[in-house]
Amino acid sequence: MFIALNKPYGVICQFSPHEKHRSLKDFVPIPNVYPAGRLDTDSEGLLLLTDDGRQQARIANPRFKLTKTYWAQLEGSPDDERLALLQRPLDLGDFVAQPARIRLLDEHETARIWQRDPPIRVRKSVPDFWLQIQICEGKNRQVRRMTAKAGYPCLRLIRVGIGRVNLFDLGIELGQWRECPTLP
């Protein structure tokens, strides 16, 4: 069984209670399912849960090269030279990130994004833009670290896809879950 959750900002990826954050238990009332990978507390979007340990490892382990798709709201203006850094191996200190596939998102696409609670801090004098980033690794805070290395602080990060599973195709509202009809 696969469960797809649209994880809100501020939710920790564990079922046990946490003193500072809501947990998965507040959203998914199904016993014996566990997250297949993690999503940082300050990130939002698609989280897959399963009761199958082998499938859980296949989704979470970078050696299986399952593509994860993120939409990142970045501070600054798009610059071809800086964005090209994301499409090459990028030394992040403790590891070298493999090249990402990227594309700028248009207003039609970003109109599908829900309001965040709490909202991000917007500075009128500093522009921002949305970028789709696809990676196959998923190391700790990798997308945020990659965009920062390219000179773009990440204001908001939403995972919209894992393999063939897409959050928008499933039509899951923020904080809601449903059984996933497609394997990643």
PLM regions and their residue ranges:
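RNA pseudouridine synthases
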Residues: M1-P184
